[in-house]
Amino acid sequence: MPTINQLVSQGRKKKVWKTSSPALSLVYNSLNKKQTEIPAPFKRGVCTRVATMTPKKPNSALRKYARVKLSNGFEVTAYIPGEGHNIQEHSVVLIRGGRVKDLPGVRYTIVRGTQDAAGVANRNQSRSRYGTKKPKPKS
C-alpha cells in the first residue's frame, strides 16, 4: 500500500495492454512508406508455404498451417482449420485472430469459405466456422 506522498509524486500507473494478434492492427501506406495503427478484424494475404506441424506434448497429430504474407507486409503463421483443404502456395486467403493452443507461434486462423480457401466438405455442424453452405433437404 503506497503512502500519500508516494501517490502524489508518482501516481498510479495504467496497466499496459498488449494485443494478442499484432499483425491485424497495422496498415501499410505504400505512398509514404509508413505503417499506421488501424485495427481490423481480418487481413488478406498470399500463402508462401503450406505444411504440417506436430503439436506440443500430450497431443499428437499433424496440424496443417500456412505461412501468409499479409497486405501490410507482415509474414505470419496461420492455422488451417477443418478436415482437408485446397490451399496451395500463392493462394489468396483471409486470416483472423485466434491462436492454436498446442502449436507454438501460431496466432492466426485462416477463414474457410472465402477467397481461395474452400469450405469444408460434408460438414453439418458448426458450418459457419468452416465456410460450408447449408445442405439441400432430402425430399
Swiss-Prot record:
Subunit structure: Part of the 30S ribosomal subunit. Contacts proteins S8 and S17. May interact with IF1 in the 30S initiation complex.
Domain of life assignment: Bacteria
Source species taxonomy: Bacteria, Bacillati, Mycoplasmatota, Mycoplasmoidales, Metamycoplasmataceae
Protein name: Small ribosomal subunit protein uS12
Cellular component aspect of the GO annotation: small ribosomal subunit
Function description: With S4 and S5 plays an important role in translational accuracy. Interacts with and stabilizes bases of the 16S rRNA that are involved in tRNA selection in the A site and with the mRNA backbone. Located at the interface of the 30S and 50S subunits, it traverses the body of the 30S subunit contacting proteins on the other side and probably holding the rRNA structure together. The combined cluster of proteins S8, S12 and S17 appears to hold together the shoulder and platform of the 30S subunit.
One Pfam family per UniProt: Ribosom_S12_S23
Gene Ontology annotations of biological process type: translation
Naturally occurring in which organism (per UniProt): Mycoplasma mobile (strain ATCC 43663 / 163K / NCTC 11711) (Mesomycoplasma mobile)
Keywords: Ribonucleoprotein, Ribosomal protein, RNA-binding, rRNA-binding, tRNA-binding
Molecular functions per Gene Ontology: rRNA binding; structural constituent of ribosome; tRNA binding
